[in-house]
Amino acid sequence: PCIGRCEQAPAVAVGQHPVAYASCESVQAKVKAAVTTHTPSGFIDRAAYEAQGGYRLLKQCIGGEHDVESVIKTMEDSGLRGLGGAGFPAGRKWRIVRNETAPRLMAVNIDEGEPGTFKDRWYLERDPNRFIEGMLIAAWAVGISKIYVYLRDEYHGCRAMLEAELSALRAHPPYPGMPEIH
């Protein structure tokens, strides 16, 4: 199956460890060393993200400095669209879901299998808390009670890193009443 690393071709997975720009020698070395897992390094963790002003917009939304209608209107006016193939306008999607009766749930699909799908992993491996903050702003604007995150199996290291960041977030949520994240 595709391992979502087109930008590192040829790429091979040894167990769940990606080998970028693979050669016979580099793959054999990973096999001999029994390197079968991978955790991204050098990403912006929560402390660094907050030091750069991260979670400020979320806290402003929760604190009432921004109202739901203006945030959804900003999304609609931005022209931002989903990149999963259909190109559905994100602001319209937020409004449609917001207008449905509760409970409202959110499914975050970090891999829809489209060409260029490695973009999701590329951003997430570098700046996971920006993704988390955006997800929580969307949840606030739409009135979400539970969030379900899907990440493809081939992104094992990314999943381990994201699980650690989400665990830290649950231990010290940026606001009371944060939605459950699964």
Predicted regions and their residues:
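Feature of Fe-S/electron-transfer and energy-metabolism proteins
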Residues: 1-182
